[in-house]
Amino acid sequence: MAGTANCIDILIAIILPPLGVFLKFGCGHEFWICLLLTFLGYIPGIIYAIYAITK
C-alpha cells in the first residue's frame, strides 16, 4: 500500500492536520505550511493536510 493514504492517516489529518502531515513527511516544508494554514483557519489546514497526504 505504498503511496496511498489509509483511513488512519486521513482521520488523523482531520482531527489534527499538522500531526497527520508530520507523521507522513516529518518536519519539512509540508508540515510548516499545514501548521500555518491551521493557525489561520482550521478548515484550510484540514484541506491541505488531506491533499498533502493523498498526493
UniProtKB/Swiss-Prot annotation:
Membrane topology type: Multi-pass membrane protein
Record keywords: Membrane, Transmembrane, Transmembrane helix
Function description: Plays a role in the regulation of membrane potential. Could mediate a proton leak.
Protein name: Hydrophobic protein LTI6B
Record-linked PANTHER family: HYDROPHOBIC PROTEIN LTI6B, HYDROPHOBIC PROTEIN RCI2 LOW TEMPERATURE AND SALT RESPONSIVE PROTEIN LTI6 -RELATED
Localization terms from the record: Membrane
GO cellular component, one term: membrane
Family note: Belongs to the UPF0057 (PMP3) family.
Tissue: Expressed in shoot and root of cold stressed seedlings.
Induction text: Early induction by low temperature and abscisic acid (ABA). Late induction by drought and salt stresses.
Domain of life: Eukaryota
Main location: membrane
Membrane spanning residue stretches: 8-28, 31-51
